[in-house]
Design a protein with these regions (language model features):
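Asp-based, Mg2+/Mn2+-dependent phosphohydrolase catalytic module
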Residues: 1-8, 110-217
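N-terminal helical cap/lid subdomain that shapes the substrate entry/recognition surface
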Residues: 3-98, 109-111, 122
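Hydrophobic residues in well-ordered beta-strands that form the structural core
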Residues: 20, 104-106, 180
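A short helix->loop->beta-strand "cap" motif at the edges of active sites that frequently abuts
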Residues: 99-100, 176
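N-terminal-biased segments
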Residues: 101-105, 119-120
Length: 217
């Protein structure tokens, strides 16, 4: 897994990467879809890794305020924290990283992201890039570029952990190295990058210059 390579920082997607929330999200989105005459089976595959406002805007529904609808969905998700759980090994792995060498980069709004991270029992990042921090969400690279900038590193020296095609596309466009997290996937959706089912066996070595290298225990 990226053997013989050192990184300046690690950037984590949130949902599906360091914590599990997809069941709750899909239930809320399915209810919203049905209330607007949309087949949930058609909508749900499009929501992963993408800002809610962009998902709704793409539907081009007449008379719908995408910002207002996205806020309603966000508030419903904030109220539904039961069943949020960490990806195995995520808490220990994140805890082994220097606090100024990692960030969370999510398409969720900040309030929702902070609630989910807390509910999962994960360390709260010093740097959290959320939906409202960018003008264009994933697939665009802006979120990962901003995270690297705030950490004071080159994004090309960063390692991104992602689980969704939109996030992988964003990280690729930014020029970062990528590891797929496939905890809740039968198989990786792409073979372009290394993949891991969990963080249980991942270990990090911190060099004197705060460079990070990873290996499987």
């Amino acid at each position: 897994m990226h053997s013989n390579k050192e990184f300046a920082a690690v950037l984590f997607d949130m949902d599906g990467t360091i914590l599990r929330s997809i069941g709750i999200a899909e239930c809320i989105w399915a209810g919203w879809a049905e209330s607007h005459g949309i087949d949930p089976a058609v909508l749900l595959p499009t929501i992963h890794g993408v800002r809610a406002v962009e998902t709704i805007s793409r539907l081009d529904l007449p008379g719908i305020d995408a910002e207002a609808e996205a806020e309603r969905i966000t508030q419903a998700e904030i109220a539904a924290m039961d069943g949020i759980e960490p990806i195995p090994g995520a808490a220990a792995f994140i805890g082994s990283l220097p606090t100024d060498r990692w960030a969370v980069v999510t398409s969720a709004p900040r309030a929702l992201a902070e609630r989910r991270i807390e509910a999962a029992g994960l360390p709260m990042p010093a740097i959290l890039i959320a939906a409202e921090d960018v003008t264009v969400g994933k697939l665009a690279p802006e979120c990962y570029l901003l995270a690297a900038q705030r950490l004071g590193v080159l994004v090309t020296a960063g390692l991104v952990f992602e689980d969704a095609p939109a996030g992988v596309a964003a990280a690729e466009a930014a020029g970062a190295s990528i590891t797929l997290v496939t905890a809740y996937q039968e198989r990786p959706f792409t073979e372009r990058h290394p993949a891991t089912k969990s963080f249980d066996r991942l270990r990090v070595r911190v060099s004197p210059g705060n460079r990070l290298s990873l290996w499987l225990a």
